[in-house]
Amino acid sequence: MTNTELLEKRIADSGLKKNFIAEKMGISRTGLLNKLTGKTEFVASEIKLLCDLLGITPEDMKLIFFSSGVDK
């Protein structure tokens, strides 16, 4: 389960626009928002791309994308 709060913070801190991130991911802005709200899950290739775009370390990746018991 994705820690959407932490991911949203990383996006805000990066200064990148969600439209730009969605375009780089090859999905619509709505598709990205569905993932950020927990309606749909990120797939491995999307996680890798987000980590590259946002400069997320492997340690932070685990906290954001693979923590158990994370609240939506």
Predicted regions, residues:
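Short basic helix-loop element that most often maps to the first helix and adjoining turn
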Residues: 4-24
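Short alpha-helical elements of helix-turn-helix
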Residues: 4-5, 30, 44-48
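Recognition helix of helix-turn-helix/homeodomain-like DNA-binding domains
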Residues: 27-41
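Residue-level signal for the short linker/turn that defines the boundary of a DNA-recognition helix
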Residues: 16, 42-45
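Short, charged recognition helix plus adjacent turn
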Residues: 9-10, 14-15, 34, 60-72
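DNA major-groove recognition helix of helix-turn-helix/homeodomain DNA-binding modules
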Residues: 45-60
